[in-house]
């Protein structure tokens, strides 16, 4: 029961502090919180890809068949690019494994 009383008193203290200092709560922006790690860069890339694909392409000016063809074209290009990247990474992996096997066994 004591913990609940402490929680309530801290909430009251926060409310009093907010009333004295104003009601605005500082929240850092995404740019301020960014650390520059790889997963943030990948997320930013896919976010920009989304904005380019769904927002900037003028589907609303096209007929439904034209927009369908353009949509299919971009999906095919993206899929083939992803396939090529995957094949390249796998070839590097198998080349490395083959080299390591040769270095370890000499055969």
From Swiss-Prot:
Organism: Eremothecium gossypii (strain ATCC 10895 / CBS 109.51 / FGSC 9923 / NRRL Y-1056)
Coiled-coil ranges from the UniProt annotation: none
Official protein name in the record: Serine palmitoyltransferase-regulating protein TSC3
Transmembrane segments annotated in the record for this chain: 72-92
Function: Stimulates the activity of serine palmitoyltransferase (SPT).
GO biological process terms on file: 3-keto-sphinganine metabolic process; positive regulation of sphingolipid biosynthetic process
Primary localization: endoplasmic reticulum
UniProt topology in membrane: Single-pass membrane protein
Recorded GO CC terms: endoplasmic reticulum membrane; serine palmitoyltransferase complex
This protein's UniProt keywords: Endoplasmic reticulum, Membrane, Transmembrane, Transmembrane helix
GO molecular function, one term: enzyme activator activity
Keyword check for Nucleotide-binding: no
Subcellular location per the Swiss-Prot or TrEMBL entry: Endoplasmic reticulum membrane
């Amino acid at each position: 029961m004591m913990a609940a009383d402490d929680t309530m008193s801290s909430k009251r203290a926060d409310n009093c502090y907010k009333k004295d200092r104003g009601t605005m709560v500082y929240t850092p922006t995404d740019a301020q919180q960014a650390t520059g790690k790889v997963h943030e860069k990948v997320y930013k890339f896919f976010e920009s890809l989304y904005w380019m694909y769904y927002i900037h392409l003028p589907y609303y000016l096209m007929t439904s068949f034209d927009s369908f063809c353009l949509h299919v074209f971009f999906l095919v290009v993206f899929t083939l690019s992803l396939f090529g990247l995957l094949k390249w990474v796998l070839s590097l992996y198998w080349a490395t494994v083959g080299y390591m096997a040769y270095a370890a066994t000499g055969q």
